[in-house]
């Protein structure tokens, strides 16, 4: 009988070796030099009973600091938001819980409709014409948007604000590293917001696109209308990396003339996780529809006039025209897109607005509390994040905060040397007044101690 966790019996091994004409495992690996072979058992503990193993693993897991054990003020792209209970219940259903790409529409109508609804919701939030079925994460969507701009305009310069997520800039640089002709011009900040004078100077007739974040990485809301005015007449694209929850309250980028709007739907129904997965969205205009990366689901009719859904405009994709594909992205995050769709649908337009308002109010309350307690809070119109200056390294402050039941904000020194000892603090609808008050008080005590 085979081991419970190792299904190969000695008989199985013999049959496999006989099939390939090898007499033993050693003969199978005979080409491997003997001096690099490990001639002993692995130095690991022997097996143990399932009950004791679970007990030991739970003991290890209980050492973790999580949002269930600590109040989280950490954001920087991943936020602790409320997810309606219906989200997990729906995405766990067997008809959705699959990574299969629905190439065969006749057997995939439910999945295709779910993706179509996601695309529709994204278009409504961003005020754009068309959205794809999702991408790996917001930063992937951003990098793909920049590549689209290069290819569409046939220009080689892109102007980006340093207010963009620093990892988005890193990924973009990785994307264009093999294309020496591409130039990335980074525009400095004025405090926590893009220096508009320097941005205007950087944009010229050779610019393929201008890219900003909304709200930006430092929590401040950029002036999209003003930025768009710098682009007019330059034949450059306007790319906006937007927090979709903030769009429940802020004027959507499409209303300011954005050509491409990208972002991450993690705030809607996707929990905070160590390393993901997330769900990027990519929305654009009809003019650029045929250059969109990733999958597109369209609505159609069958021979009998019934409404149906199919993957459409597939000639853009590498499984149809590999050498002329708009992108090498051939997958998506359909399950997470479904989670976000369910969350948005459960909340509704008013619910999204209400939660966005709560984020705004809670963050501004926390900002004022920090000011009242003697902290320097950097100026900027905030949504749910803001920057606070400390007298000590943020890494040390956060270690101490964890001992008092708090997950502190992001150490901005990791993003930029200009923000050493600055903390990016996120305050969502889940943070209570008592948690905020205690967090600010404890931060003040720790900041004053050596």
Swiss-Prot record:
It catalyses: N(6)-[(R)-lipoyl]-L-lysyl-[glycine-cleavage complex H protein] + glycine + H(+) = N(6)-[(R)-S(8)-aminomethyldihydrolipoyl]-L-lysyl-[glycine-cleavage complex H protein] + CO2. It is an enzyme of class 1 (oxidoreductase). Its EC number is 1.4.4.2. The keyword Oxidoreductase applies. Pfam families: GDC-P. It comes from the Bacteria. Signal peptide: none annotated. GO terms for biological process: glycine decarboxylation via glycine cleavage system; nucleoside metabolic process. InterPro entries: GcvPA, GDC-P_N, GDC_P, PyrdxlP-dep_Trfase, PyrdxlP-dep_Trfase_major, PyrdxlP-dep_Trfase_small. The keyword Oxidoreductase applies. One of its GO terms (molecular function) is glycine dehydrogenase (decarboxylating) activity. Belongs to the GcvP family. N-terminal subunit subfamily. NCBIfam families: PRK00451.1. The glycine cleavage system is composed of four proteins: P, T, L and H. In this organism, the P 'protein' is a heterodimer of two subunits. The glycine cleavage system catalyzes the degradation of glycine. The P protein binds the alpha-amino group of glycine through its pyridoxal phosphate cofactor; CO(2) is released and the remaining methylamine moiety is then transferred to the lipoamide cofactor of the H protein. This is Probable glycine dehydrogenase (decarboxylating) subunit 1. It comes from Staphylococcus haemolyticus (strain JCSC1435). The lineage of its organism: Bacteria, Bacillati, Bacillota, Bacilli, Bacillales.
């Amino acid at each position: 009988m085979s081991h419970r966790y190792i299904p190969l019996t000695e008989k199985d091994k013999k049959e496999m070796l006989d099939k390939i004409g090898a007499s033993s495992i050693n003969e199978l690996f005979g080409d491997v030099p003997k001096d690099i072979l490990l001639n002993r058992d692995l130095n690991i503990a022997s097996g143990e009973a399932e009950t004791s193993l679970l007990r030991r693993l739970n003991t290890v897991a209980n050492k973790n600091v999580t949002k269930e054990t600590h109040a989280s003020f950490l954001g920087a792209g991943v936020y602790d938001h409320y997810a309606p209970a219906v989200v997990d219940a729906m995405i766990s259903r067997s008809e959705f819980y699959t990574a299969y790409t629905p190439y065969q529409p006749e057997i995939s109508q439910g999945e295709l409709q779910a993706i179509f609804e996601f695309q529709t919701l994204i278009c409504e939030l961003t005020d754009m014409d068309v959205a794809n079925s999702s991408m790996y994460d917001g930063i992937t969507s951003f990098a793909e948007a920049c590549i689209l701009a290069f290819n569409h305009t046939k220009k080689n310069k892109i102007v980006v604000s340093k207010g963009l997520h620093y990892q988005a800039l890193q990924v973009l640089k990785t994307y264009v590293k093999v294309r020496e002709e591409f130039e990335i011009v980074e525009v400095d900040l004025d405090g926590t917001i893009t220096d508009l004078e320097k941005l205007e100077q950087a944009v010229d007739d050779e610019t393929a696109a201008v890219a900003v974040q909304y709200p930006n990485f430092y929590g401040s809301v950029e002036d999209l209308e003003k930025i768009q005015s710098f682009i007019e007449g330059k034949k450059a694209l306007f790319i906006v990396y937007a927090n979709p929850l903030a769009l429940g309250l802020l004027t959507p980028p499409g209303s300011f003339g954005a050509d491409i709007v990208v972002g991450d739907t993690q705030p809607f129904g996707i929990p905070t996780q160590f390393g993901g997965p997330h769900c990027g969205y990519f929305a654009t205009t009809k003019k650029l529809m045929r250059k969109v990366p990733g999958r597109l689901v369209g609505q159609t009719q069958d021979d009998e006039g019934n409404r149906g859904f199919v993957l459409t405009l597939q000639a853009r994709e590498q499984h149809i025209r590999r050498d002329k594909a708009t992108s090498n992205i051939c997958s998506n995050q359909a399950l997470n897109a479904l989670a976000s769709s369910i969350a948005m649908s459960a909340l509704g337009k008013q619910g999204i607005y209400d939660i966005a308002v709560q984020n705004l109010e809670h963050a501004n309350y926390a900002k004022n509390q920090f000011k009242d307690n003697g902290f320097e809070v950097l100026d900027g119109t905030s949504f749910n994040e803001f920057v606070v200056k400390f007298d000590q390294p943020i890494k040390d402050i956060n270690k101490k905060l964890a001992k008092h039941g708090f997950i502190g904000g992001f150490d901005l020194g990791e993003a930029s040397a200009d923000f050493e000892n600055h903390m990016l603090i996120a305050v969502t609808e889940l943070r209570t007044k008592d948690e905020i008050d205690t967090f600010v008080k404890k931060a003040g005590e720790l900041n004053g101690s050596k």
